[in-house]
Amino acid sequence: MDPGIANHTLPEEFEEVVVPEMLEKEVGAKVDVKPTLTTSSPAPSYIELIDPGVHNIEIYAEMYNRPIYRVALFFSLFLIAYAYGLDGNIRYTFQAYATSSYSQHSLLSTVNCIKTVIAAVGQIFFARLSDIFGRFSIMIVSIIFYSMGTIIESQAVNITRFAVGGCFYQLGLTGIILILEVIASDFSNLNWRLLALFIPALPFIINTWISGNVTSAIDANWKWGIGMWAFILPLACIPLGICMLHMRYLARKHAKDRLKPEFEALNKLKWKSFCIDIAFWKLDIIGMLLITVFFGCVLVPFTLAGGLKEEWKTAHIIVPEVIGWVVVLPLYMLWEIKYSRHPLTPWDLIQDRGIFFALLIAFFINFNWYMQGDYMYTVLVVAVHESIKSATRITSLYSFVSVIVGTILGFILIKVRRTKPFIIFGISCWIVSFGLLVHYRGDSGAHSGIIGSLCLLGFGAGSFTYVTQASIQASAKTHARMAVVTSLYLATYNIGSAFGSSVSGAVWTNILPKEISKRISDPTLAAQAYGSPFTFITTYTWGTPERIALVMSYRYVQKILCIIGLVFCFPLLGCAFMLRNHKLTDSIALEGNDHLESKNTFEIEEKEESFLKNKFFTHFTSSKDRKD
């Protein structure tokens, strides 16, 4: 309802006559002051009606409303985030050493691109599963994927196996992050939402300073540095498991009749019906496969086409691009619009500008970050002469500063309750930061400039990244849609990662070899400098002509990447101005927790709101005419 009208008090006779009687004639249905479903509405099918995961988590939240329970729950989220956050910092470093050990360091972006394509689709997949089968069940599945992928990565002997392990790891990590974000949202009101969302991010404050020590202690033994997390992370998940089992116990003890069996579909439906209704339609398997193939065909070739031998004109680069754009994308759109019963991209949600432009922001966040961050560690070690410990800490500064700023802002939003001004301010900080990164991009004199730029980048990120997520959750309106909207936001975030990694990889693999060849005349030496930079710098130390040539090449390429990031900050700012500026209320969602409201209900609400506006305006102008 329009705020200007909401702030006026309707005359008594208007409230008594218009709402119960006149409104019924206008809407054409029996309505209350709070509209409900009419008997003429078609009964929802079993699949549309039942979301046991959403229903039960609301009951669990009631059982866990004591402060001591909430503290224990959020501490368990913190513990898991601490584990995967430290792993991420360390793995980011050792991934560079792993690809370099295969003499294929330039394929680092390809590995990242493949992982993020899988992660993007995995967000929606896990969100839908968690709504149906519950948060805890999907958390267990995610942990299994995480550990399995970690083991495969640590034992990989070539880039192919490393990429396969990375896909499983990323899928598991995606599920864990999503479930933690959703649980944090399930147990927090909108005005506390930003602070709750930052609980899983708080470990970055610690990990920034200790990850460098850990990587230095492990040294270049990247296999152990990655593999040890296959058992560390599952151990860190035990406290959350205890909390989830405890709240389930309390719910069964005090509200057993209200709970819905999370695997009821398996009992009520035959196996064939279950596979068709749940696995095929509800999860939209066809849509997921098509969108995965599309992004794989379009993005991965970008990172493979360059290098010492350009391959843009070869069939294995052109064919996937043609298949992706000409065949797969039209098929996906046709399926989603015409045939899918539960589209991956629900059009009724995306049409809301508060959701659509928030998704665009999510895309540009990671796209822009990858422009400066994809090869930042390599640039710091090779072109800025940083140690392993120093480079690891510097690359973590972004997360460190953003978490501190975002947490402080979380307390501010409890009272302020508006998000849009902070989002605009944060993006403005990014514009300045990328401008600084264009200037400070290499050589030993860039040390302080890069640190300052990354701190400013983190300051801006803390002001708008998670704030945008809180904004899009408010735009979802109902708790039932919160997990889906969150997954769309995180999926778009990962798609931005995929495009960013793809573009940065394309720039790196196509321009860097040429720049190195211009400055290093020996083809064999140039190939070594490009393919195995960490091995190269041990032989050609700081100050040697060969090292200076490599530094100048890195400076040139990093400048191009940062300019691309700077340019795309302006569309990011434009999207921020188009967002809704919701007031964050003392409820889980703007329209409460009733997740069984159908489309008919919302149509009645819209008609009621429009009707009340018109009638109030008529009454107001009539009264004014009478006074005149």
UniProtKB/Swiss-Prot annotation:
Q: How does it sit in the membrane?
A: Multi-pass membrane protein
Against CDD domains, the record matches this protein to: MFS_ARN_like
- Asked if the keyword Amino-acid biosynthesis belongs to this entry, the reply reads no
Gene3D superfamilies assigned to the protein according to its UniProt record, in alphabetical order: MFS general substrate transporter like domains
GO molecular-function terms, A-Z = siderophore uptake transmembrane transporter activity; siderophore-iron transmembrane transporter activity
Mostly located where? membrane
Q: Which GO terms describe its biological process?
A: intracellular iron ion homeostasis; siderophore transport; transmembrane transport
Any one annotated GO CC term: endosome membrane
Top-rank taxon of the source lineage equals Eukaryota
The record's subcellular location field reads: Endosome membrane
Keywords per UniProt:
Endosome, Ion transport, Iron, Iron transport, Membrane, Transmembrane, Transmembrane helix, Transport
Which InterPro entries does this one have? MFS_trans_sf
Role this protein plays: Involved in the transport of siderophore ferrioxamine B and so has a role in iron homeostasis.
What is the name attached to this protein's record? Siderophore iron transporter 1
Gene behind this chain? Answer: SIT1
